[in-house]
């Protein structure tokens, strides 16, 4: 038996409950993984919150999409993107629907080796945010020597995007709240406080102009400023401003004509693992909660200023 978190109905974090259920025996192309840590992402509560539609048939809804752990059982022909999988392998899993669980059976195609340089908590928070960061950097085509502005640079996606870009020789300017400016600076970016006067502070930090933008905040101010700074809206990408697609900016994660980036995201783990091995990226874990505290984790993350990744410990 495994413990897992489900949403009993659509609503806020109060609809979550911790239950016990059997763990399916892995079939062909599947493995079972014992969770060591579980990544928490805004999409987790948006799904049971109804932001992406409501289907009563989906209830009770398993929650979560990524985890790190140890392979405990292997089905026939279970081969991940890095090769055949074996019992005892230390892995990162994404996508892993229902990841808020002590043990989970998943497609082998979702399972990648855990970089030994990362803790369980760090590995649990790497793949979804990291895939989004790689996806965003790829669609705007930012390259060495260019200047990149990241709105919301202190969050899980923003911090990873900043580190990856810096490792690739890109100059990064990142907006953040006052309490998170040092965290952004720590990873080689120029930190700029958001709020009144943001336009002037960004122009001062980038006297030569801004070539591309990643928006992780979704605010109207962020998109309006980005359109003012960057002549080509196709070099602006947002992971939240889904209602601004008519401006010509690129969207990932939702909205009309969003870029799915299926191949980019599926292959992103290789770049992320390589950068982790080289010491070029870290996963900043802002806070951990127990599996039973998933609702509290969601309330904290929904406040909008986590300062890194939120992780559950089974």
PLM feature segments, named:
Residues 22-39, 51-97:
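Glycine-rich beta-strand-centered segment in the early N-terminal region that forms part
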Residues 65, 78, 90-152:
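NAD(P)H dinucleotide-binding glycine-rich loop of Rossmann-like/cofactor-binding domains
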Residues 75, 80-84, 174-183, 220-221:
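Short glycine/proline-centered loop/turn elements that form peptide/ligand docking sites
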Residues 85-86, 142, 230:
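Short, well-ordered loop/turn sites that connect or cap secondary structure elements
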Residues 130-195:
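Mid-domain Rossmann-like dinucleotide-binding core that forms the NAD(H)/NADP(H) cofactor-binding site
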Residues 198-208:
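Short amphipathic alpha-helix with an adjacent loop that forms part of the alpha/beta core around
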Residues 220-281, 314:
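Glycine-rich phosphate-binding loop and adjacent beta-alpha segment
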Residues 270-314:
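C-terminal hydrophobic helical "lid"/dimerization subdomain
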